[in-house]
Regions:
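C-terminal edge and immediately downstream basic/flexible tail or linker adjoining helix-turn-helix-like DNA-binding
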Residues: 3-4, 158-159, 175-198
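Short, charged helix-capping/linker segments at alpha-helix termini
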Residues: 17-27, 37-56
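Arg/Lys-rich amphipathic alpha helix in sigma70-family domain 2
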Residues: 80-99
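Helix-turn-helix DNA-binding module
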Residues: 130-133, 137, 141, 149-166
Length: 198
């Protein structure tokens, strides 16, 4: 998150804590909802559930508004709430073992790779999404927070309640598993592109 965005969030946080400013609360919601949605939906595999959890995150923020000035990093604070809600949801799901296949197909993670760095076929994108989706829970959460939500290692360590070294190790494991899983051969892809012209 940019310094300007961080300063703005801190300003909104103060307005909410001191004055119960509903306009600041709405702006905070608009600012943090998109990254929270990507994070939660990547874990719970359900867009409607993710939307509901975002509401729950902000209800908790509003309920704790008097104490918000004590929160050092509201962005991290919201992601910790989101993580806990997501894990609680998954635990309930595991107990009931009821899965909705449509939710899985709707929420394949949308891994972004800069097109200037790499031409990628639709099939390769699908393979990458499946590889990310098949990562173990903690690896996937760390990968999502760092690669899709642009959190720093230290912030992820705070969110996950683990050491920075563990974050580094888990990200390395995630990247290795993704790489192995997709069995990517750049030279072969480039040859196919040159021969077919696609």
């Amino acid at each position: 998150m940019s310094t300007i965005a961080s300063v703005r969030i801190r300003f909104l946080q103060t307005r909410i804590a001191r004055f119960e400013d509903q306009q600041a609360y709405k702006e905070l919601f608009v600012t943090l909802s998109p990254p929270l949605f990507r994070f939660i939906s990547g874990i719970v595999k359900s867009k409607p559930v993710a939307e509901e959890m975002i509401s729950d995150v902000f209800i908790k923020v509003w309920e704790k508004r008097k104490d918000l000035e004590l929160v050092v990093n509201l962005n991290v604070y919201c992601f910790v709430i989101a993580k806990n809600l997501s894990l609680n949801f998954l635990e309930k799901q595991r107990r009931t073992t009821t899965l909705n296949i449509e939710d899985f197909s709707d929420s394949l993670s949308e891994l972004y790779i800069d097109p200037e760095q790499l031409m990628i076929t639709s099939e390769m994108a699908d393979r990458i999404n499946l590889a990310v989706d098949s990562l173990p829970g903690r690896c996937k959460m760390i990968f999502t927070l760092i690669k899709e939500n642009d959190f720093k290692y230290k912030e992820v360590a705070e969110i996950m309640n683990i050491s920075v070294k563990t974050v580094e190790n888990q990200l390395a494991i995630a990247l290795k598993k993704i790489s192995t899983s997709i069995n990517f051969d750049l030279s072969r892809t480039l040859r196919v592109t040159l021969v077919t012209g696609n």
